[in-house]
Amino acid sequence: MAPGNEMQARNGGGAAMCAAGCGFFGSAATDGLCSKCYKQQQPQPRHLIGTAAGDSDKTSLKVVADLSTLVIKDNSGVGGEGTTVMAPPATVTKAKNRCKACRKKVGLLGFPCRCGGMFCGAHACAFDYKAAGREAIARHNPLVVAPKINKI
């Protein structure tokens, strides 16, 4: 047997070479092409063509540089068209990972306080939340004193 015949016998006898002539075997599912030639033949999406060719400057989207204010038209007014200018959203603060008292990095061992600070194991918040809670309850619930009843 010739070496070419052995390959055909192992592959089922019906394996054909790539129609593009690259030397690999093609399949009926890819129109007689190998996988590499089939991928090259398929049309690429437009957003991938520009980046593959190096023309990213031409296909890049136009970005608005100034996003400091948003203008929204308000058509609810009877007299005329008004505009409302809204401020940009507040900046996002990073997660606090240092002790508020000693500025030592606490990582996962730190514990947050209701005041918004982070503390290490050696320090704690100086604010007395128990006393503040007692004062708030006393302020919102005044003491009601009933007058004494006269005995008959």
From Swiss-Prot:
May be involved in environmental stress response. The keyword Metal-binding applies. Keywords: Metal-binding, Stress response, Zinc, Zinc-finger. It comes from Oryza sativa subsp. japonica (Rice). This is Zinc finger A20 and AN1 domain-containing stress-associated protein 10. It comes from the Eukaryota. It holds the Pfam family zf-A20. PROSITE patterns: ZF_A20, ZF_AN1. A zinc finger (AN1-type) spans 93-139. GO terms for molecular function: DNA binding; zinc ion binding. A zinc finger (A20-type) spans 12-46. Zn(2+) 2 binds at C99, C102, C120, H123.
